[in-house]
Each structure stands twice: as C-alpha cells, then as structure tokens.
Amino acid sequence: GFVFVCLSDSSPALPDYLGEVSAELNACGMADLRFYRRMVYDLDCNWKVFVDNYLDGGYHVPILHKGLSNAIDYRGYKSRFGERHATQYCEMSNDNESEETRRGSMANYIWLYPNMMFNFYDDILDTNLVIPVSENRCKVVFDFYFTEGQFDDEFKEQSITMSDRIQAEDEMICLSVQKGLQSRAYEVGRLSPEKE
C-alpha cells in the first residue's frame, strides 16, 4: 500500500481528497501488486514541466515514444478529469514486440494532484513521484510493481528498460521546454478563456 501524509489540520480526509481516484486505483488490481524496484531521475526542469508533459493527453506519444506507441492503440486515447486528478486511458495494441514489455488489454495513466502518477498496464504498475528541488530542477522517483507470480525477472527487467527509454525521451522534451521557458523570447501566454 501507500502512505499519504498531510501536515495541515484544515485539509480534507484522504478518502475525500482521493475521491473517485480510490475506486480507479482499486479497479486496477493494486492489492495483488508487489514492489520490485525503484529508479530515481534528476531532471533539469521545473517539476510542473514534467507534470505538463504527462498530462498532454498523449499528444506527444506517437511522435516521441515509438516503442510505447506500438504498445498502445493511440487512436482510442481518452482523458477524464476530476477535481484533483486526471485519468488517461486507451486499449493496448496486439503488437508482438510490445508483449515483451507490456501485457494486458488497457493502459491507464492516473495523475493525482499535485505530483503523483500511477501508470497501469493490467498486472504492471509504475508510480512516479515528482519532487521539486529548485525552480529549474526536480527529481522523479519511479517505483515498479508487478503482480506476484505473473512475470519472470527477465520480463520485469525488459519492462523497466522500456520505461527507462521512455523516461529518457520525456527528459529530452522536458529539458527543451525548460530551455524555451528561460529564453528571452518567451512571453507568458494568455490563459485559456474557456478553462481558466
């Protein structure tokens, strides 16, 4: 399980804060998952740049993540938004190569405000915790979980290798965005009149 800590007396109780995320996490079979490994990435970008990249609705997946793009059916990519979370989901493809690292029928990506992500591929989960370090740096902690008894170590290692490759691709784009934000040419744009 997970431990959530709040240092404020005025915050809502955890079930109220999680809202429908609780049901979504339970539906993904978290009770059967077992921790396997942790990887930590230090990124030279603001933590919100990483979160924004995660929440773009899969827009960058077919362009930037060829391996992941083969594993999921991007044409059916959908997003749902709640008060303190966003869920992105799509069906997995039947690509033989992707079966070496991802299995199942659905990919579910759940973001919990402000800095926690849950990435489910049926019997596989990786969590991402984004930790601000400074204005232009963050740390991202990846924890990998697999359903007990379902996968051998070779499959787990291949799955983590694919995740590491995806992270390297995301890091490249996040660093480019951060560089653009620091450019003299950058001007803050308008907020969305419809959403903000």
What are these regions (language model features)?
Residues 2-196:
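C-terminal catalytic domain of Rieske-type non-heme iron oxygenases
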